[in-house]
UniProtKB/Swiss-Prot annotation:
InterPro entries: Isoprenoid_synthase_dom_sf, Terpene_cyclase_plant_C1, Terpene_synth_N, Terpene_synth_N_sf, Terpene_synthase-like, Terpene_synthase_metal-bd, Terpenoid_cyclase/PrenylTrfase
Name of the protein in its database record: Alpha-bisabolene synthase
GO biological process: diterpenoid biosynthetic process
Keywords: Cytoplasm, Lyase, Magnesium, Manganese, Metal-binding
Induction: By wounding.
GO MF term set: alpha-bisabolene synthase activity; magnesium ion binding; terpene synthase activity
Note on cofactor: Binds 3 divalent metal cations per subunit. Can use either Mg(2+) or Mn(2+).
Amino acid sequence: MAGVSAVSKVSSLVCDLSSTSGLIRRTANPHPNVWGYDLVHSLKSPYIDSSYRERAEVLVSEIKAMLNPAITGDGESMITPSAYDTAWVARVPAIDGSARPQFPQTVDWILKNQLKDGSWGIQSHFLLSDRLLATLSCVLVLLKWNVGDLQVEQGIEFIKSNLELVKDETDQDSLVTDFEIIFPSLLREAQSLRLGLPYDLPYIHLLQTKRQERLAKLSREEIYAVPSPLLYSLEGIQDIVEWERIMEVQSQDGSFLSSPASTACVFMHTGDAKCLEFLNSVMIKFGNFVPCLYPVDLLERLLIVDNIVRLGIYRHFEKEIKEALDYVYRHWNERGIGWGRLNPIADLETTALGFRLLRLHRYNVSPAIFDNFKDANGKFICSTGQFNKDVASMLNLYRASQLAFPGENILDEAKSFATKYLREALEKSETSSAWNNKQNLSQEIKYALKTSWHASVPRVEAKRYCQVYRPDYARIAKCVYKLPYVNNEKFLELGKLDFNIIQSIHQEEMKNVTSWFRDSGLPLFTFARERPLEFYFLVAAGTYEPQYAKCRFLFTKVACLQTVLDDMYDTYGTLDELKLFTEAVRRWDLSFTENLPDYMKLCYQIYYDIVHEVAWEAEKEQGRELVSFFRKGWEDYLLGYYEEAEWLAAEYVPTLDEYIKNGITSIGQRILLLSGVLIMDGQLLSQEALEKVDYPGRRVLTELNSLISRLADDTKTYKAEKARGELASSIECYMKDHPECTEEEALDHIYSILEPAVKELTREFLKPDDVPFACKKMLFEETRVTMVIFKDGDGFGVSKLEVKDHIKECLIEPLPL
């Protein structure tokens, strides 16, 4: 169906674009293309080799096998040992009354797992408060069972040598959870056994004072009324607990807030059968040690999904993601969720992460859930006493708030609160401990505050996360612990490899794009901007999957054509010429081009060929006639251009409503998006489904994309356009409607239109319907990248701006393996 090649007609259509009848014509191309043909064709990625794809396939299979036990059914969590909790379980005496431990294997584990420096803990991560708590706990249990004299001696020496140094972690908010509650209690026990430790250090007295202050604020009755975070550390407040009453807040699984240490302590005071049942179940699961939390099935699943999504490898694990999120959703409730399905206390980090991931995957979740995390004055609560945990909670709340739909005011409140908190936390983290630096805490906060989710580049996001993702990442509770299913070398290797493989595919496509562009005839229009790579980036940064190569290619062709038409209507063509060209488009008749000037004849031929090609490919993919659909779309689009040309010629500034109504069409986003989405391999869009994302005049995805693109463009280009004599922009139109307002006030008004439009776009994208999600995603991701392009300036007009760096990151520079 495609027409005669435009290039074959170049010789017969003699186009002298530098001079036409003595007219003085303007150009829209003050900034040349920075991505030359030779540069693009010099790119040679080794990752195009099949051996890398084969390795990626092996990794995908290995990860699927690894994740299967974690997400199937109730799952089998993998979590590192807690020497501290294991020591508490090792304290439990045999229930048959014999003078031996009920769980002797835990004592053996402690004897065999002391580190070379005399401490206990995770060897790969040193946090002194963690080591001190675990080491003193292990020393005390070995003394109880009168074993391990050498280990006891080495443990005491470690504590004596390091006890004073823990003050540094206190100053920097890097202590393990409830350290000031538990450690003084253990020290009192050690002192009663006459262990030779420096009990009179000023820091120890300070710690004891902090413990007393915290307990003084505690309502003793509330401990027994509703589950509270202190249930996690009951072993640290044995002196005040009424053991019979504490059973009223026991968890369904027999534990106290999923803590083996706390549960073991309660069992030793009460002999409760459910406590023992919980301890037995944990020992059966882990063998000869216990973790600091169990189960962590909800948090673990969410973190697995989050890492897979953020590393950009989610297309390989759609089944696993669905299973994990279905499981979380089954346990979702209006009060929020904890780290485990049986945890009676909602956790802000887990709830916010769950909300974001469930909403992103189109589950029905309400933001009203965050009301549970406000105090009596309506302010958000975030104070667990553990800095890293609080920051993780706020980061997740901040990210969740960016998925707001219209009218969800609580998410606006959450965003405001989290932003303020994170800015303050950033100052603190930059001067805090090496632990926070090792965990990339400052980087995470900075990036979150700098980069809005709606104005971010999906492939750059994946690359950045590969650069900060830590396979050995450790979390902090009462001890330092790791979740190997969540952070591991396989995820990182696949993330990097997959990024580079995709990039190598894109580089081959870029060569095809630049070759086509060079031969298309479009470079002959020297008045127009040449941005083939920027337009390829616009689609490839979001719709990057290999199977959508044709979608990317035709999208880029259309965008390149649109740029010539845009610059022709805006700057180069006379009003009489533009009227003829618009009529030629309306007639869809090549013979009518005889009335056009030579440069427009060539332009019309290229236009005719590209529209035919796109319509033909769309018809093949969708199985129905679409030429008339595309013809009407292009006609509307160019009529919008022509109306703006008339405004310019008449020096007319329309009302803002007039401007926006026309601008939604003349921005050209609708026809551009349709030229991609209808050609996505394997994605059938019935007419009914298509109308749910594309219906002129209705606020659906293409309409909202067009509105956002038009206004985002205006906020960064209106000054340059005004200098060229183009008077109509949303800012100028608003100032005409409101002569009393300043330019800054006009800009603020435009942003006040943009913000709710972005929320509407998010809702349209994420609401469940029968539209193929890949199609909605393509439309949505293109909007995100467009907002990036106009974030700091006119990224299309001046291709040397930040967009250049994004293109390099996304399409040029691979990740080192």
